[in-house]
Amino acid sequence: MSSKPPAIFLMGPTAAGKTDLAIELTKVLPCELISVDSALVYRGMDIGSAKPSKEILAAHPHRLIDIRDPAESYSAAQFRADALEAMAEITARGKIPLLVGGTMLYYKALIDGLADMPAADAAVRAELEAQAEALGLAELHRQLAEVDPVSAARIHPNDPQRLIRALEVYRVSGESMTAHRQRQFAESRGADAGAGGHLPYTVASLAIAPTDRHILHQRIALRFSQMLEQGFVEEVRSLRARSDLHAGLPSIRAVGYRQVWDYLDGKLTENEMRERGIIATRQLAKRQFTWLRGWPEVHWLDSLACDNLSRTLKYLGAISILS
């Protein structure tokens, strides 16, 4: 048994039932919950993010929910710092951090650390945004391929946020994002919990999903329809009423929100909005599965099984995470 304190990751695609299982675990284990979800960090974005209800959050508090205004950004590096702080506080009380959510980049940031990148430069960013508007994202992607082919291969040509950030890093520092990461990795080998170090916990990685992908697709479609019935469009309408929010913000680009925003902009019909929202959520689930297939030592659970709690406890006992 490792001398490191234990932590549990409960991962899985959207609409798989992660929150329900996490709450069941807190009833039988000395765990406290930490949300790992890039949409749940935002206040006022409740319906479209499938945020647990106020009643559930009151009975089963989750850290890192409602910690940012939608006008603000929230990076993987910020998540790592916040999560490490929360995990340390939970561990100090003799309890186990139970991290639950589907933002796989956040989990990776915790496990592998992140390279220290140059701070954002407003002037450089404004110049790049102007270029994107005037010349198109394809031109920015071409520029990135010239100075950082590794990042260009990794970043989709239609991803303005990451394209601009990668070019910004190069223009501010004169060094590519790939070079920064490679140097940071070399310097951080053997480190513990620093920005590039490894996570100082013994982690049990769990993932929950239906074994039949068709069932997950049905659940995604049903949940999106339920969100619309619960007032998702009105929620986005309220966000649009704020003068400081726009479609380019990370919060508004969240799956579902950008489709409803486009609908309210008149770019989509109601049926198109519904269809594209469901498709985008399916694509998110596919990306989450891709991450999870490469995740080391993950223990899978079937969303439809009636004994997931006992299966989880048996697994945790078998790997001595609870010793």
UniProtKB/Swiss-Prot annotation:
Its EC number is 2.5.1.75. ATP binds at residues 12-19. It catalyses: adenosine(37) in tRNA + dimethylallyl diphosphate = N(6)-dimethylallyladenosine(37) in tRNA + diphosphate. Its cofactor is Mg(2+). It is an enzyme of class 2 (transferase). The record marks 103, 125 as: Interaction with substrate tRNA. It comes from the Bacteria. Keywords: ATP-binding, Magnesium, Nucleotide-binding, Transferase, tRNA processing. Residues 37-40, 161-165 are annotated as: Interaction with substrate tRNA. GO terms for biological process: tRNA modification. One of its GO terms (molecular function) is ATP binding. Substrate binds at residues 14-19. Belongs to the IPP transferase family. Monomer. This is tRNA dimethylallyltransferase. It comes from Pseudomonas putida (strain GB-1). The lineage of its organism: Bacteria, Pseudomonadati, Pseudomonadota, Gammaproteobacteria, Pseudomonadales.
